Amino acid sequence: MTPVLPLTDFATIMVLSPHLDDSVLSCGALIADAHHLGVDVVVVTVFNGRPVPPVSAPASRFHARCGHTDDNAMDEREIEDAHALGVVGARTERLYLPEALYRKDQDGKPLYDSDLAIFMETLRLSDDELRAVECRIAECVDDVDPDLVLAPLGIGGHVDHLLVSVAAQRLDRDVLYYEDVPYVLYERCKNWRDGMAGHAPRVHVCTAEGWSAKVSGIECHRSQHSVLWYSPDTWREDLDSYARASGGGRQAERFWSRHDR
């Protein structure tokens, strides 16, 4: 029988969110249900730094797809995130590191010069990037002192998700890893569980209120929907189907340990 994650065992849960929407997308129901039970939930957004002009061509294309300009993109996304986290009942910490499309080398050239370059299933993570992320996350964890840390598994291979996932593995804390939405829904990621062979998930069976809060929280990130979903008109149904498959017919979110076999 798949073990259930007992939320009342924790006074404070920290959710490491690579970007401003990842926490609500991947574990918004757990956040809402934990908050309802009196648990202090802190969402730490790692990559929400402003781009330094000139903005790369891939970053400008991304902004345009989301309906933003190069100047207002992060401000608009933070407003959406504040609304989303208010819906699910989390407080927020932000580390203001630049996300992949904004990062540059010492000569001012983009580190990732195409949309596909940020997906690194086979490429080696940069030591400098990892060191910066690891240091900032460790400092925040020490300040908040959570009983449990939730971090991304890195499904989909987005370099920012992988950096946060690897940094979390180096924490001297109890860490569980969430399934990265929307990537876990993508056909190209269907074999992600091959990398978790021998590991058993913990399951959070969502309350109706928790699931509703998750969906409402995701809706707050309206500018991102055109880039998140293969089928923007059916994402609610697609997410519901996946959640019910994860929970044996009941809506559920799953969390994995990298240590128990």
Indicate residue ranges for each PLM-predicted region.
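Short acidic, gly/pro-rich beta-turn/loop elements at beta-sheet edges
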Residues: 53-54, 188, 215
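Hydrophobic alpha-helical membrane context
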Residues: 31-33, 172, 191-192, 232
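Short, flexible loop segments at boundaries between secondary-structure elements
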Residues: 174-195
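Acidic, Ser/Thr-rich peripheral helices and adjacent loops at domain boundaries
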Residues: 61-67, 193-202
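C-terminal accessory domains and tails appended to enzymatic cores
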Residues: 2-8, 88-89, 107-145, 173, ...
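Active-site beta-strand->loop->alpha-helix modules in alpha/beta enzyme cores, enriched
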Residues: 1-167
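Residues that form or immediately flank small-molecule/cofactor binding pockets and catalytic motifs
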Residues: 48, 97-99, 183, 209, ...
